[in-house]
Amino acid sequence: MPEAKPIFPTVEYQGRVARLQSAMQAQAMDALLLSTPADIFYVTGFLTRFWESPARPWFVVVPIDGEPVAVIPSIGAELMGRGWLKDIRTWDAPDPVDDGVSLLAETILQHVPSGGAIGTPMGLETHVRMPMADFARVTALIAPRRIIDATAVVQRVREIKSEAEIAKIKATCGIADRAFARVPEFAQIGRPLDQVFRDFQIALLAEGADWVSYVAGAAGQGGYGDVISPATDKPLAVGDILMLDTGAVRDGYFC
């Protein structure tokens, strides 16, 4: 089975890391701790649906100088190794006693001087993807090093898209556009709404989506009360207003 090609060339990720490091320097930050799918994907290209399992934490440490360090469960070593990172540290997970805590702390100690600061996103639309008890253990193990908010560092860098990213986003939006154009093929009077949802997901996949994270929508006479409920088997009727929203992903980019 041939290996999948990297989503971007190495130079794209190197540029992202360089911009993060420049922003970190401006905030007197010695390293950056990333733990969420989007942030880790951004600096490594590590793309997997295995994130849907909550059983394992994953980390990437971005030092103020040099390349990022992946601190990940051993199950992800091969996939991460296909990317551009060279320093990949693993543990056998899940481990109820030490699920990456000591390995992460050791990595931080190597890259952050005593009294230094490691940033991690803490603001709106962020979270730390590890048990709070383990986060507290890491904090204690790396003291007197401080963990500070890196929301602005990460978000200001990520929100400025490269031409390569724009092309990926455009491609994913094109998939959604083509799928929406096919809605009249299956959204017909008498067709159950839950089947319309399934047909829409099928259309997204047929048009090139790698997967469909969700489909949101609703239908009702003159409007609808909410768009987050699961679809029912109620048939579409004359006078219904139908709304569909996509959750399509292609090469890690979403529409």
Show where each model-derived region lies.
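Flexible, acidic/His-enriched mid-domain "rim/lid" segments that flank
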Residues: 2, 17, 95-212
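Acidic, glycine-rich active-site loops and adjacent beta-strand->loop/helix elements
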Residues: 37, 94-95, 122-125, 220-223
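Short catalytic-site patches enriched in acidic/histidine residues
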Residues: 40-52, 151-156, 160, 191-255
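A general structural motif
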Residues: 57, 67, 113-117, 144, ...
